[in-house]
């Protein structure tokens, strides 16, 4: 009996070791005790790039885009040539609405002109002033391909300022499974098959025609470096990988 327990203990230990080394998590936490550290690393890091319209500050609400609610875009991300398949997620809130109210989360980020992303957007459709949806885009050399993920009112509808929402994408090769955080839970939004181009890349966030604040952006998967800073966004672990990130 003792030998069986010994074998079981060894197996569990090895499994936990593999999990911690093969699937780490990296969270840029913009509202916790180390928000300034994460802001500096994300905005001024060696692998960071952003577009010309960018202007970023750290406020009590998190990583905050400027208050220009015109149609100009702001986007920022970190490149990572060796990141392949992973899950990226961010929680955010709108501080001020404009015309389209876009909040973006980027994956396979190469730079500001080459990336994949998915976004919230509000369009006027046949006079409907409250037509919210989630869309996907692929940007190559500054040129876009785009399409719809969902406009299901049970997932995304009537979004408000100063309310926490989230976007999550599980990236597997060229497929991204998208979820939206609304009403205190994650909801499956749909899947995207991106038309080729990028097999690796980093993560980022962006916005257009609204002011947005991001509480955190997190990425996990094989090859993602872990960090040792506890993340306590919204008074709890920022992601489902929070315990793993802490090395527990």
Predicted feature locations:
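Short, aromatic/His-centered strand-loop micro-motif at the edge of beta-sheets
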Residues: 141-168
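Extracellular carbohydrate-recognition regions
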Residues: 22-50, 229-242
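Extracellular glycan-recognition surfaces and repeat-rich motifs
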Residues: 34-73
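Carbohydrate-binding surfaces in secreted/extracellular proteins
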Residues: 30, 90, 159-192, 217
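Flexible glycan-contacting loops in extracellular carbohydrate-active proteins
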Residues: 189-218
